[in-house]
């Protein structure tokens, strides 16, 4: 197994697993806010500690990554830390952190290089005010407000998480329904739930531009009726993902991409 970063890949380290850990923290916080509804009395008021939630989420991911490392060792599977590149003749070139290159040969090669946040031309990520999903998992301070662009699985999960811990969230979707690949009745029900929780939903809308005014993001959003400017602390771009296929030797070996 050739891996340049953490074992377990994107899903385990920067996707499904740590996201679900954050959502669990939000769920527990919500339970505590409504403890009396369950016949539970609390002294004081529950507060959402985002840094502590992030620490727990990262700990869950790191623990599972170490579990992958243990399983590889237990099953006598070699782990090569470095960047892999496919070469003609069923060979793989691995460059480690020091720059040393080692070549391996195999009868079968599996390419599973994961994905990253896709950037829109008019929504360039700076990692601080306009962010992708990785930064959304590790924000050091809870923002007061956030615009989430894209309502697929990634956008909807983060919108729900941040809304649940007290952030004013606006969810922007280009298509007529949020979570557009789901059945329409599912989309409508989720939209009702989000609105009931205090989230602002803008469908059939697109972000035209983001301008900075000090620490405030001024997001120009084109709606079916006009252009609306929404001010927020953070813009999360969650429109799509891009595959990590650059520089791994596909062109040199004649391997064609499909939907990549």
Model-assigned labels for residue ranges:
Residues 1, 147-148, 171:
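Hydrophobic Val/Ile/Leu positions in short beta-strands of Rossmann-like dinucleotide-binding domains
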Residues 4-5, 149-152:
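Glycine-rich Rossmann-fold phosphate-binding loop(s) that bind the pyrophosphate
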Residues 4-142, 170, 175-179, 185-186, ...:
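Glycine-rich flavin
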Residues 55, 111-112, 148, 237-238, ...:
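Redox-cofactor binding/interface segments in oxidoreductases and associated redox assembly factors
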Residues 127-142, 234-260:
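FAD-site-proximal beta/loop scaffold in flavoenzymes
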Residues 159-164:
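Gly/Ala-rich phosphate-binding loop of Rossmann-like dinucleotide-binding domains
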């Amino acid at each position: 197994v050739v891996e340049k970063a953490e074992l377990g890949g994107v899903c385990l380290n920067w996707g499904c697993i740590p996201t679900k850990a954050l959502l669990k923290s939000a769920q527990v916080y919500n339970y505590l806010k409504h403890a009396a509804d369950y016949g539970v009395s609390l002294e004081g008021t529950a507060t959402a500690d985002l840094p502590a939630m992030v620490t727990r989420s990262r700990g869950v991911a790191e623990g599972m990554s170490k579990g992958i490392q243990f399983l590889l060792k237990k099953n006598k599977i070699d782990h090569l830390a470095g960047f892999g590149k496919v070469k003609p003749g069923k060979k793989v070139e691995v460059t480690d952190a020091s720059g040393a290159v080692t070549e391996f040969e195999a009868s079968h090669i599996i390419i599973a290089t994961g994905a990253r946040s896709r950037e829109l031309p008019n929504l360039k990520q700076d990692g601080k005010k306009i962010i992708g999903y990785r930064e959304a998992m590790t924000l050091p301070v809870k923002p007061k407000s956030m615009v989430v662009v894209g309502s697929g699985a990634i956008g909807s999960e983060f919108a729900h998480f941040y809304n649940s811990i007290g952030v004013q969230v606006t969810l922007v979707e280009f298509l007529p329904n949020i979570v557009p690949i789901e059945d329409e009745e599912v989309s409508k029900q989720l939209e009702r739930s989000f609105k009931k929780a205090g989230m602002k939903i803008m469908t059939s809308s697109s972000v035209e531009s983001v301008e900075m005014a000090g620490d405030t993001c001024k997001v120009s959003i084109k709606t079916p009726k006009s252009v609306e400017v929404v001010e927020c602390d953070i813009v999360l771009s969650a429109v799509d993902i891009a595959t990590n296929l650059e520089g791994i030797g596909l062109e040199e070996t004649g391997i064609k991409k499909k939907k990549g």
